């Protein structure tokens, strides 16, 4: 219990009475030595409006400003002084003459004559305007305008003759193609001419012809030791084919039927017969 009593007596008693009071140190006031000063106070001047007549300074300043001032209107436009540049003319490139505003030319002497004492420049008259120079397509100068017009007319005639000129083909194949173009049916009514047997041989112009070309990169791997068996897709045999036909013969039968059908179609148009009913008398 003694420990508990000591604990309570320590924290429950009045702390202010038990603790010793700290002494506060007062700051010492720094005393400055008093210095004696002689201050003179003047009596103020009486207030009032100064008279213009008796004020000499004001009269002198007013007189100076009146002498310096000039009667100027505040609302008048401001005038600026500009320096006008004198036009000295320009220099010609071809002969070096200097042309002034008075249409007078001053010739510049050569450098050899500049060193001489006589450096007087005499004005010369203006040269007349040069005539226009006409040139052809090759760059040659054309002096006569009539000759130029004749050349243009001849050129136009030559172009018209070229349009009317018909080219004659020399090779046999070119002549055949030219004849086909000349005798081509122009009206386009081939279907109506069913009695004409030659219509079966006329090619339809509306169908587009495919251009056949050989693929060099793929033709290297094609069978080339014998005859390729034809098929409806025109696919050649491979390079490693041994030449033995192992198919069931469907492709050959299909192609044979196609050729027979086309042949019968042409034959029926050529040898077509008509039954004519003739009345008995």
Curated annotation (Swiss-Prot):
Ranges in a coiled coil: 142-181
Gene coding for it: CWC26
Stretches with biased composition (Low complexity): 100-119
PANTHER family: BUD13 HOMOLOG
GO biological process assignments: mRNA processing; RNA splicing
Bias kind Basic residues: ranges: 20-29
Gene Ontology terms: cellular component: cytoplasm; spliceosomal complex
InterPro entries to which the protein is assigned, alphabetical: Bud13, CWC26_splicing_factor
Region entry Disordered, spans: 1-68, 93-123
Assembly description: Associated with the spliceosome.
Role description: Involved in pre-mRNA splicing.
Keywords: Coiled coil, Cytoplasm, mRNA processing, mRNA splicing, Nucleus, Spliceosome
S-S pairs: none
Family: Belongs to the CWC26 family.
Species of origin: Candida albicans (strain SC5314 / ATCC MYA-2876) (Yeast)
Source species, domain of life: Eukaryota
Compartment list: Cytoplasm; Nucleus
Lineage of origin: Eukaryota, Fungi, Dikarya, Ascomycota, Saccharomycotina
Name recorded for this polypeptide: Pre-mRNA-splicing factor CWC26
